[in-house]
Amino acid sequence: MSNSANAALAGPWKDLWNGDLSLTDKIIAEDFIAYAAPITGTGPDEIRGREALKGWISGIHAVLPDLSFVIEVGPITDDEHLVVRWKAQGTYHGGFPGAPTEAIGRHVSFTGTDILRTAGGKLAEYWANTDSLLFFQQLGVREVPALGGYGS
């Protein structure tokens, strides 16, 4: 895929994370896999395929219904990769393990970097680097829940 074709996937990728799950079949490969520690507490091996990705995104939006992402840097591309640095913000509505009830209604903001590999005009692999510590601190989480798949 060309650099410009890869760059064209950045906007729809952001829109997908902003909650437009209708984009999934258009931009995500059937055998998609994410290498990430989701803030929802599931392990990385559970994020395989389109439906798992939609479930992950839906889970995050259940905790932060007004969550929105903006791309701050990028897209940076080569023949088969797309990289973006983003900022996300939203209002916590409860449901995160370990977060105190007084965190409900709190505005949170955090950043991350996504590295994606493309194949056949779609996104096939995803490596996420999210500032989860900042997210947890803003919620007042004192003990981070164990994330399956890492050191277990």
Task: Annotate the PLM regions.
Residues 1-152:
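C-terminal and inter-domain tail/linker signature
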